């Protein structure tokens, strides 16, 4: 399926000079959303995934239906102050600035094969931080899946050595 026809291009959002790729039209179209999910599920099955991990918030939108289809758990990666129990955290840079990501300390068992999902690969900061959290807890990053990659931001360079699936590139 041509997923680009279901991704809206929004200039100057969230600030001037940024060209935002909006995946909500894809989510609004049941067939497109299912097709995207099915491609990621097929990719995950080849990697014997034990757990899906996704950074907030759009990583949840991609990861939860994938974890449901695989019948494995989903572990959310959240911003500081959003998880109620004991956490580990990492500072990171992203396309629009700096932030902190966290995960529950008991979310991943050592040796679990993890699929990381997110909507977009831009500079790679969010995914690099998510990888750090997964690996600090002893998880094995068995794959990383994105709907969209902004190739001109060269985030893929931060993912060298990891297996990556991207459904559409800009």
Curated annotation (Swiss-Prot):
GO MF annotation terms: adenine phosphoribosyltransferase activity
Keywords, ordered alphabetically? Cytoplasm, Glycosyltransferase, Purine salvage, Transferase
| Family matches, as Pfam families | Pribosyltran
Q: Which GO terms describe its biological process?
A: adenine salvage; AMP salvage; purine ribonucleoside salvage
Q: Does the entry feature the keyword Membrane, yes or no?
A: no
Specify where it is mainly localized: cytoplasm
This protein's source sits in the domain of life called Bacteria
Q: Part of which pathway?
A: Purine metabolism; AMP biosynthesis via salvage pathway; AMP from adenine: step 1/1
The answer to keyword Iron-sulfur applying to this record is: no
Reaction catalysed by this enzyme: AMP + diphosphate = 5-phospho-alpha-D-ribose 1-diphosphate + adenine
**Gene3D superfamilies, sorted:** 3.40.50.2020
Q: What is its EC number?
A: 2.4.2.7
Compartments, as annotated in UniProt: Cytoplasm
| A GO cellular component annotation in the UniProt record | cytoplasm
Q: Which family does it belong to?
A: Belongs to the purine/pyrimidine phosphoribosyltransferase family.
Could you tell me what this protein does? Catalyzes a salvage reaction resulting in the formation of AMP, that is energically less costly than de novo synthesis.
Quaternary structure note: Homodimer.
Its recorded name reads Adenine phosphoribosyltransferase
Gene responsible for this protein: apt
């Amino acid at each position: 399926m041509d997923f680009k026809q279901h991704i809206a291009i929004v200039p100057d959002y969230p600030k001037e000079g940024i060209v935002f790729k909006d995946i909500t039209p894809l989510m609004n179209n049941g067939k497109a959303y299912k097709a995207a999910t099915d491609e990621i599920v097929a990719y995950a099955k080849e990697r014997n995934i034990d757990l899906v991990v996704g950074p907030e918030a759009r990583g949840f939108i991609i990861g939860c239906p994938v974890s449901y289809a695989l019948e494995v758990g989903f572990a959310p990666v959240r911003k500081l102050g959003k998880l109620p129990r004991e956490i580990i955290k990492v500072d990171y840079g992203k396309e629009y600035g700096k932030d902190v990501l966290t995960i529950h300390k008991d979310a991943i068992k050592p040796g679990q094969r993890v699929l990381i999902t997110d909507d977009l690969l831009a500079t790679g900061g969010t995914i690099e931080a998510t990888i750090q959290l997964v690996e600090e807890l002893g998880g094995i990053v068995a794959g990383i899946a994105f709907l969209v990659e902004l190739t001109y931001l060269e985030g893929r360079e931060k993912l060298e050595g990891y297996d990556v699936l991207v459904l559409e590139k800009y």
